[in-house]
Amino acid sequence: MLIRIAATPAFMPALMPVSAHAQLRGGLKFPADFGAHPEARTEWWYVTGSLQSGVRQWGFQVTFFRSSTGIEAAAGGRFNPTQLLFAHAALTDLEGKRLRHDQRIARSGFGIAQALGDDTCLVLRDWQMARTPSPTDAQRSRYRAQVASETGGFAFDLQFDATQPVLLQGEAGLSKKGPGANDTSRYYSEPQLTVQGRLTFEGKPLEVTGRAWLDHEWSDAFIPAQAVGWDWIGMNLDDGSALTAFRLRRADGSAVYAGGSFRRAGQMVRSFGPEEVTLTPGRMWESAASRARYPVQWTIATPAGRFTVNALLDNQELDSRSSTGAIYWEGLSDLLDEAGRRVGRGYLEMTGYAAAMRM
């Protein structure tokens, strides 16, 4: 997933001490870099995955965004909106063929919203997500996310446990997002998270298990001026591997820049250069709500292989104009190999199809 706060709405004119398991990885220092970076203009923590209870399956998303407004606190005291927090949550009901979603927005502070800087600790009204070291391995993470949506008719309280080391995207965590020298972000992933917890769906509590993917990214940079949006996948493969691929896209559909990575379980990450990744759109679906046309099938060529991505539900479009200002597509999808066999599952994200992203 790429940084995606598209517009600013009306607001704009007990953790382990660092010394317990601090480590430096390519300029990123953990656990501090699990936390917020208020000096960066834009930042997000993003978790997507699949859930199962019996034979029934769902996809889910929970994302917290932090945006620095550039307004000095001294100008208006503690009431000045120096930091804004946003959150999105979504649930894809495969059996019911329906996406449910909700969103939140608030200025930081006043006991309403916060993003702490020493570790992942995010609160936005009644939604929250936090990280602690795993009780079985202090070098790995355990996350907990709690979300409830009356309008969406769902709630979840989920625990995510890391099974692999942190995956540093790009060059040791410095990820290129365009041809320019400043088109970069700090970016790491935690793929292959095991999930367990409770999903409340249409008033019925269900114990669920699953697999998830977490991204954390922050930057002062924006997408290149010639880009109108992007296409991205984060896939957990059944053999324990993790695949990322993305492209930033011009209005004519050509790529401004592309990248990604692949890591087999227990091995080093292989980052992809812009000439090594090709994302080719296939079958299209038109949204009745926005009239945007999205490719819900993709062919993706990488040094790790050639794959097909198939959306498991066509209508996974989210309207976030009440918070981050964009309409985008974010949905549970399968990953197929060249023989058409399913080899993984994860999320596909597409932006800039309803309207060009302006950041």
Name what the model sees in each region:
Residues M1-A20:
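N-terminal export signals
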Residues H21-M359:
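Structured soluble/peripheral alpha/beta segments that form catalytic or ligand/cofactor-binding pockets
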